């Protein structure tokens, strides 16, 4: 029995080379991880995935990369702690759940980063801070100082005070990650996902192509995706494309 090597095209080789060059030369890197990546099938924080993420980010930091992690997961962690099956629709309840879950989320990260002697810091933001010039500069200065101290900031939306009706929310952390990238002048934004990539059509189609590279997010690209949310999270591929547009 012979095992055939998968066929690798010239374009795929070039894409890999470009990605490696960007990663190698990037000084500041923003990594965004969503709830679906951080949780298991039961909606609980997945300790193995958090451990893997902390390990990889710590390795980047050890290479003198300045790394910022934008992480969702507070609501999911709070729902698990309070034994809730569905994401609360009532705003006050949702914010209370997020407050409970944020502690569990940060404890999980802290535990894993400590195994690599890597210090992390919590930074909670709302859109209000980045809309106001003075607050914007304060946030920027704080993040830059943390990075200069070789600390990995863990950024999340402050769900306990962010109110969508008052436009103080980012809508999802994909947009927050893009804003933090611009705020810091980071050369690289990595958005982690629980799917293989961007499909040129339905992911359920047997012959649907995965797009290795997207040069520009236009109407054609956006037509491939749809808004998706579930009991634990908001976002989906559409919000990721909107964030980088």
Language model features: what each stretch is:
Residues 2, 11-245:
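Nucleotide/pyrophosphate-binding catalytic subdomain
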